[in-house]
UniProtKB/Swiss-Prot annotation:
<keyword id="KW-0812">Transmembrane</keyword>
<protein>
    <recommendedName>
        <fullName>Costunolide synthase</fullName>
        <ecNumber>1.14.14.150</ecNumber>
    </recommendedName>
</protein>
<keyword id="KW-0503">Monooxygenase</keyword>
<keyword id="KW-1133">Transmembrane helix</keyword>
<feature type="transmembrane region" description="Helical">
    <location>
        <begin position="3"/>
        <end position="23"/>
    </location>
</feature>
<keyword id="KW-0408">Iron</keyword>
<dbReference type="InterPro" id="IPR002401">
    <property type="entry name" value="Cyt_P450_E_grp-I"/>
</dbReference>
<dbReference type="GO" id="GO:0102934">
    <property type="term" value="F:costunolide synthase activity"/>
</dbReference>
<dbReference type="GO" id="GO:0005506">
    <property type="term" value="F:iron ion binding"/>
</dbReference>
<dbReference type="InterPro" id="IPR036396">
    <property type="entry name" value="Cyt_P450_sf"/>
</dbReference>
<dbReference type="InterPro" id="IPR001128">
    <property type="entry name" value="Cyt_P450"/>
</dbReference>
<keyword id="KW-0349">Heme</keyword>
<feature type="binding site" description="axial binding residue">
    <location>
        <position position="432"/>
    </location>
    <ligand>
        <name>heme</name>
    </ligand>
</feature>
<dbReference type="GO" id="GO:0016020">
    <property type="term" value="C:membrane"/>
</dbReference>
<comment type="similarity">
    <text>Belongs to the cytochrome P450 family.</text>
</comment>
<dbReference type="Pfam" id="PF00067">
    <property type="entry name" value="p450"/>
</dbReference>
<dbReference type="GO" id="GO:0051762">
    <property type="term" value="P:sesquiterpene biosynthetic process"/>
</dbReference>
Length: 494
């Protein structure tokens, strides 16, 4: 170990001990929670590949609203629909802020995006632009040709590999990345491969354990250990690529195609003005990074889980394939066909319920002292909503940890944020604005995979033997990538 690293750790240890010894004892009526260790509090209880399950298990013992001390960060976790409603509806404005983190400040241009920006007028106006201009249902439909073109390419690749195992996980990640990059940046990103590589490094960084996140006084460790320099280098790589994209879009001028990508929209809004603040290139780049980071991991993970559950339940696979093959006329699926694929939509909803793409929603921060369920929540408290625990709440769902798409038949519950037993995209002011876009990247590809191909497990593997061990980063995915065998069905073989 380097001498500088040893000195840093010694200084950090002394700081932590001093913090623990001198911390005042609160007299507030905080929610109950597990016992806290000296100095670290409850940090050790979140060091798990599946923290949403750990927190659900703790909530069963200590209650649906629970207090954890994560280093210096006072944290409240809610794990039932009733308490989620308290946070995201009843007291939504009190919990509309985001905690400030070093990484969000670096990667998202001082948190000038939509996901990490503090609650206020800037965030409200940018969210409005996002909702009305960038990710409206009409705008998402306008990208249908991009999705269709990419699925056509994927289908040809699968046809050429029919009968041999393919890595379904890698394939869907590539597909989702291609669509999101083209819809966001158009054809002008010459460095897409580098961009995607750096984006995944950013996602890993955002979800990685960082001691200074729990002890703000230890930010110097990020400098001494070289982490901050590494993050700044990554941000510079992203900025250089996005700067080239903006220059390319501006150089097109009146020669632009009829298809407006999201950068076109943001530059148009910037040039038009009419807001209470001046939109800068940094604002544009921050929002573009939101689009790129928010959709890539979550959409591909949802597709992976949906196909995994169908491989584990062959009767569901057959029912879904029978439906799509009876609805589609010709050899091409259009997005209008999706409206008639009722069972497929049930499969997607059940996948989102049981395998919430972000099981612990993006953290919120309490803006002011308030009271929830009889407990004091001090200002600046970090709030975690366990969306997965809400989606598997036994008081809300029968047999909650089983995959049963039929539970949504004739069921009015949906994922739009009004039903707190089902909040894969969040709810309230901070609900994910990319909900419609994200769904388009799951339903349409899944319909294509089920229509054009039959599927089997490799090497004689039985459905119940398929490993469904989870691992959590930004989203929760399979620990071991899904490898399956595409086969061209006789009914549509050429």
């Amino acid at each position: 170990m380097e001498p500088l690293t040893i000195v840093s750790l010694v200084v950090a240890s002394l700081f932590l001990f001093a913090f623990w010894a001198l911390s005042p004892k609160t007299s507030k009526n905080l929610p109950p929670g597990p016992p806290k260790l000296p100095i670290i509090g409850n940090i050790h209880q979140l060091k798990s590949p599946t923290p949403h399950r750990v927190l659900r298990n703790l909530a069963r013992k200590y209650g649906p609203i629970m207090h954890l001390q994560l280093g210096q960060v006072s944290t409240v976790v809610v794990s039932t629909p009733r308490l989620a409603r308290e946070i995201m509806k009843t007291n939504d404005i009190s919990f509309a802020d985001r905690p400030t983190t070093t990484t969000s400040q670096i990667f998202f241009y001082k948190a000038q995006d939509i996901g990490w920006a503090p609650y206020g007028e800037y965030w409200r106006q940018m969210k409005k632009i996002c909702t009305l201009e960038l990710l409206s249902a009409k705008k998402v439909r306008s990208f249908s040709s991009i999705r269709e073109e990419e699925l056509s390419r994927i289908s040809k690749v699968l046809e050429s590999q029919a009968g041999t195992p393919i890595n379904f996980t890698e394939m869907t990640v590539e597909m989702v990345n291609n669509v999101i990059c083209k819809a966001t940046l158009g054809d002008s990103c010459k460095d897409q491969a580098t961009l995607i590589e750096v984006l995944y490094d950013v996602l890993k960084t955002l979800s990685a354990f960082n001691l200074a996140s729990y002890y703000p006084g230890l930010q110097f460790l990020n400098v001494i250990l070289g982490k901050k320099a590494k993050w700044l280098k990554m941000q510079k790589q992203l900025d250089d690529i996005l700067e080239d994209v903006l220059k390319e879009h501006r150089s097109k001028g009146s020669n632009k195609s009829d298809q407006e990508d999201l950068v076109d929209v943001l530059l148009r809004v910037k040039d038009t003005g009419g807001l209470d603040f001046t939109v800068t290139d940094e604002h544009v780049k921050a929002v573009v990074l939101d689009m790129l980071t928010a959709g890539t991991d979550t959409s591909s993970a949802t597709l992976e889980w949906a196909m995994t559950e169908l491989m584990r339940n062959p009767h569901m696979m057959k029912r879904a394939q029978d439906e799509v093959r009876s609805v589609v006329k010709g050899n091409t699926i259009t997005e209008t066909d999706l409206q008639s694929l009722h069972y497929l939509k049930l499969i997607v909803k059940e996948t989102l319920r049981l395998h919430a793409p972000t099981p612990l929603l993006v953290p919120r921060e309490c803006r002011q002292d308030c009271n929830v369920d009889g407990y004091d929540i001090p200002a600046k408290t970090k709030i975690l909503v366990n969306a997965w625990a809400c989606g598997t709440d036994p008081d809300s769902w029968k047999d909650p940890e089983s995959f049963i798409p039929e539970r949504f038949e004739n069921c009015p519950i949906n994922y739009m944020g009004a039903d707190f037993e089902f909040i894969p995209f969040g709810a309230g002011r901070r609900i994910c604005p990319g909900l419609t876009f994200g769904l388009s990247m799951v339903e349409y590809p899944l319909a294509n995979f089920l229509y054009h191909f039959d599927w089997k497990l490799p090497n004689g593997l039985k459905p119940h033997e398929l490993d469904i061990t989870e691992i959590t980063g930004i989203s929760t995915s399979l620990k071991h990538q899904l490898k399956i065998v595409p086969m061209i069905p006789k009914s549509i073989a050429k």
